[in-house]
């Protein structure tokens, strides 16, 4: 009996242990459920501490190909593909100067603006060979939903620039009307227009447009070199001007009349007064090269450089530089992009020799005519004398009568 009681108690204890082990997993499962509830509130708390509009706005780089620039000699033309920026407020797109706004030039995909060189906060920089103009399109983004005062979008800025060569070589080329320089365009690279003209008078009103121009020796040649741009501060200096008997810029036979921005001092016919301007004018007497044939051609060339007026270190600001001053200058020589503009040539006639030949010819003709007239007059005089004597002699001839006397052989009676 005791044995049965012991077995019953053992079985009862085992059953109680199984019941406790069965309920403990439920308790363990409820603990992770409680713990997962805690982190769910953490993201909501972190979103309440997002950055506000007090954070300084920064510029965002534009997507590739969203902005394109055309560099002309008069302005910069900027095109913005606003289809790639659907959050821009197109009514509030300006340049750096907020007063320079897009002038309604807008279509379904692009907005474009004409950008001047010398206003709207356009900046410029120079190096030895080029002038670069820089500005930016500044665009406001649309206000946040439900607010007309704040935005959590950054202000967008699209910087752009145009680079232009500073130097060129202008020439006159045989039997061709004048043309303007056109530089080959590359990305963000523009061109200035350089011209060289010769005018008919010192008023510089009417340029020659047909060549060759025929001149006599020492006739004045009124010449002008010019750079054209809408940048009102762009100026020009002729660094060197020279003449050759051929269109070859490097002809071994040449005559230099402007060097280092200085007119040739020993040429009394040259008049050149430099001042910072986009137009430079000078006058020089027509000449010929010794050893060349009569009515030979003369070709003129000028090496010019463009600068921004007010740049104290620019070559234009230095003006005429003697060789000594030039050696002291720290400014490097800028070769630039060389091009040719056509204008000529000039045919120079030998006025002095032609005049002498005409004088000799006139004297010869006069002598010949005088000689012929003299001979004619002489013959006429002789003929008149003979005729006079012939018709005069019967009436005026003296009759001679001899009479004899006693003492004389004869006596002449008249």
Swiss-Prot record:
It comes from the Eukaryota. It is found in: Membrane. Residues 39-57 have a biased composition (Low complexity). Its main location: membrane. It is a single-pass membrane protein. Residues 18-65 are annotated as: Disordered. Residues 70-323 form the ZP domain. The chain crosses the membrane at residues 365-385. Residues 18-364 are extracellular. PANTHER family: DELTA-LIKE PROTEIN, ENDOGLIN/TGF-BETA RECEPTOR TYPE III. This is ZP domain-containing protein. It comes from Acropora millepora (Staghorn coral).
């Amino acid at each position: 009996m005791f044995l049965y009681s012991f077995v019953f108690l053992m079985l009862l204890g085992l059953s109680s242990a199984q019941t406790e082990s069965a309920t403990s997993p439920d308790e363990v499962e409820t603990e992770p459920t409680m713990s997962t509830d805690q982190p769910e509130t953490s993201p909501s708390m972190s979103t309440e501490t997002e950055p506000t509009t007090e954070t300084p706005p920064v510029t965002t780089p534009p997507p590739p190909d969203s902005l394109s620039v055309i560099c002309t000699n008069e302005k910069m033309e900027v095109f913005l593909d606003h289809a790639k920026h659907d959050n821009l407020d197109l009514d509030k797109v300006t340049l750096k100067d907020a007063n320079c706004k897009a002038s309604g030039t807008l279509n379904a995909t692009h907005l474009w603006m004409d950008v001047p060189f010398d206003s709207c906060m356009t900046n410029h920089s120079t190096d030895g060979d080029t002038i670069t103009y820089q500005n930016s399109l500044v665009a406001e983004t649309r206000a946040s939903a439900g607010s007309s005062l704040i935005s959590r979008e950054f202000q967008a800025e699209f910087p752009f620039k145009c680079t232009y060569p500073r130097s060129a070589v202008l020439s006159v080329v045989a039997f061709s009307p004048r043309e303007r320089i056109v530089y080959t365009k590359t990305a963000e690279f523009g061109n200035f227009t350089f011209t060289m003209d010769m005018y008919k008078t010192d008023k510089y009103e009417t340029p020659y447009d047909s060549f060759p121009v025929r001149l006599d020796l020492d006739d004045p040649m009124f010449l002008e070199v010019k750079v054209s741009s809408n940048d009102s501060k762009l100026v020009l200096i002729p660094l060197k001007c020279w003449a050759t008997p051929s269109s070859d810029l490097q002809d071994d036979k040449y005559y230099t009349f402007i060097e280092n921005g200085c007119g040739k001092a020993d040429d009394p016919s040259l008049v050149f007064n430099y001042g910072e301007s986009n137009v430079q004018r000078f006058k020089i007497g027509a000449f010929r090269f010794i050893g060349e044939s009569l009515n030979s051609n003369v070709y003129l060339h000028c090496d010019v450089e463009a600068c921004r007026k007010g740049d104290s270190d620019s070559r234009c600001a230095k003006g005429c530089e003697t060789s000594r001053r030039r050696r002291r200058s720290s400014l490097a020589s800028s070769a630039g992009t060389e091009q040719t503009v056509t204008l000529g040539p000039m045919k120079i006639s030998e006025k002095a020799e032609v005049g002498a030949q005409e004088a000799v010819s006139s004297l010869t003709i006069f002598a010949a005519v005088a000689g012929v007239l003299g001979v004619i007059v002489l013959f006429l005089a002789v003929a008149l004398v003979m005729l006079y004597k012939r018709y005069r002699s019967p009436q005026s001839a003296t009759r001679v009568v001899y009479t004899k006397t006693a003492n004389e052989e004869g006596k002449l009676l008249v």
